């Protein structure tokens, strides 16, 4: 009986984690679609870009990733001549750099 309860709890936790990952991916895709609209460039590899963002910037919250993409599309990190995985990652890196600089000043 205890083993069964434990197994149910483990399965529930796995399912929750999978849902969180899917929600994170869906929100990043939505942000990238908005970025395409704002920059009027097409990003050809949405799935690969999402996966890279999740892997490389896992220390950031979804809110921070979305904020970085929004600032990037607004030109806060310079002009964009294309929309690529490299460009989006550059925006996020600049966001992290700015965030760390503000933290160090406090």
Describe the predicted segments one by one.
Residues 1-106:
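Charged interaction scaffolds used for protein-protein
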């Amino acid at each position: 009986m205890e083993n069964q309860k434990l197994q149910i709890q483990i399965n529930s936790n796995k399912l929750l984690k999978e849902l969180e990952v899917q929600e994170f991916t869906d929100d990043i895709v939505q942000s990238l679609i908005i970025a395409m609209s704002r920059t009027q460039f097409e990003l050809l590899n949405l799935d690969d870009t999402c996966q890279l963002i999740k892997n490389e910037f896992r220390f950031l919250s979804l809110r921070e990733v979305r904020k970085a993409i929004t600032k990037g599309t607004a030109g806060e990190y310079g002009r964009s001549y294309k929309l690529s995985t490299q460009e989006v990652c550059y925006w996020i890196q600049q966001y992290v750099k700015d965030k760390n600089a503000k933290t160090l000043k406090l």
